[in-house]
Amino acid sequence: MNIYTSILVLSYLIGSIPFGLILSYIGGLGDIRKIGSGNIGATNVFRKSKKLAVVTLILDSLKGFVSVMLAKNFSSDQTFVFMSALFSIIGHMFPVWLSFKGGKGVATLLGSIMFIEYKFVIYFTIFWIIVFVIFRYSSLSSIISTISIMLLVYTHYSANESITFLVMSLLVIVQHIENIVRIIKGKENKI
């Protein structure tokens, strides 16, 4: 296995660390998958503990950040750096430790973006807050912010990076399909 393959595998493994689940046990909440939406991410943890949700958000973001930083230390190939982010997000969504049932990847995507282009995190956050203030849906805020950043990547990066980021974005959106259906039916929980 060459160094590039090793970094992609390591990015997947880093991404697959289920911090929301680990912190929910440490914090005495039990199995977060049996609470609220059943998701292991920060939004679901938020339903039981704001403090643990913040820590979950930070640690899930760090998974993407560390994976991208690792790739950047071994290669100046920007496409490879984006691929490392993709593998970290896939790890978060489909962790080997949890029978491939993980989170939605928003925080890990955000951490990846933070290392690649920190200004995009500011835009993401602004879009997220605006949509959240208007609609009160975390899921809708995440989807619209992800699409917005996808458009920014398309205008600032090459075709290879843009396609890789498109795949990341589509994965995040697909992970939100149930939320989209609930929003349409008027059954999505507001925060």
Swiss-Prot record:
It comes from the Bacteria. Its EC number is 2.3.1.275. Keywords: Cell inner membrane, Cell membrane, Lipid biosynthesis, Lipid metabolism, Membrane, Phospholipid biosynthesis, Phospholipid metabolism, Transferase, Transmembrane, Transmembrane helix. GO terms for cellular component: plasma membrane. Its main location: membrane. The chain crosses the membrane at residues 7-27, 51-71, 80-100, 115-135, 139-159, 161-181. InterPro entries: G3P_acylTferase_PlsY (IPR003811). GO terms for molecular function: acyl-phosphate glycerol-3-phosphate acyltransferase activity. The keyword Lipid metabolism applies. It is found in: Cell inner membrane. Probably interacts with PlsX. Belongs to the PlsY family. Catalyzes the transfer of an acyl group from acyl-phosphate (acyl-PO(4)) to glycerol-3-phosphate (G3P) to form lysophosphatidic acid (LPA). This enzyme utilizes acyl-phosphate as fatty acyl donor, but not acyl-CoA or acyl-ACP. This is Glycerol-3-phosphate acyltransferase.
